[in-house]
Design a protein with these regions (language model features):
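Class I S-adenosyl-L-methionine-dependent methyltransferase catalytic core
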Residues: 2-163
Length: 163
């Protein structure tokens, strides 16, 4: 499924799906990580996504996790609680038709997702919760407590901090 570029689209920066456009949910619901920021983040972690198991816990459009998939991730878990956002994320994931078996989609509250998946181990974790949530440290501690992080796991964390 190909999309033309418009204000509500972002693109995959590199890898197998370089240049593929992805739909973006309404900006009142999510804050999509823009192309240049994603490029800088993935350049900083270099080949960490190669062969990795990735969790994008507040996935929104799924762009961060799908970028990791495009760069060689073995398995990508995309989760978002918001139903309308999940529908867009699923559509974006399904547009990568050759990789559907590598993408696991969930429409759960982050706490439910974590509790149901304590048996998983992740190499790359993306935490970018909705505005005003300051929960990333608690999530990381939970994942450490249940050994959900591989020894050399990388965590990308973005959140607002109160002034």
């Amino acid at each position: 499924m190909e999309y033309s570029r418009s204000y509500d689209m972002i693109r995959i920066i590199a890898g197998t799906y370089k240049g593929r456009f992805l739909k973006v949910p309404d900006s009142k619901v999510t804050r999509p990580t823009m192309d240049k920021v994603r490029q800088a983040l993935f350049n900083a972690i270099k080949d960490k996504s190669l062969g990795s198991v990735v969790l994008d816990l507040f996935a929104g459009s799924g762009a961060m996790g799908l970028e990791a998939l495009s760069r060689g991730a073995k398995q990508v878990y995309l989760n978002d609680k918001n139903r309308s956002t999940f529908v867009i994320m699923r559509e974006n994931a399904l547009s990568l038709s050759t990789e559907k078996d590598k993408i696991i989609l969930s429409n759960l509250d982050y706490r439910v997702f974590l509790k149901r998946n304590t048996d998983l181990k992740f190499d790359l974790v993306i935490l970018d919760p909705p505005y005003k949530f300051t929960i990333n440290a608690d999530i990381i501690e939970y994942m450490k407590k249940f050994s959900m992080l591989n020894d050399d796991a990388v965590i990308i964390s973005e959140q607002d901090y109160p002034n």
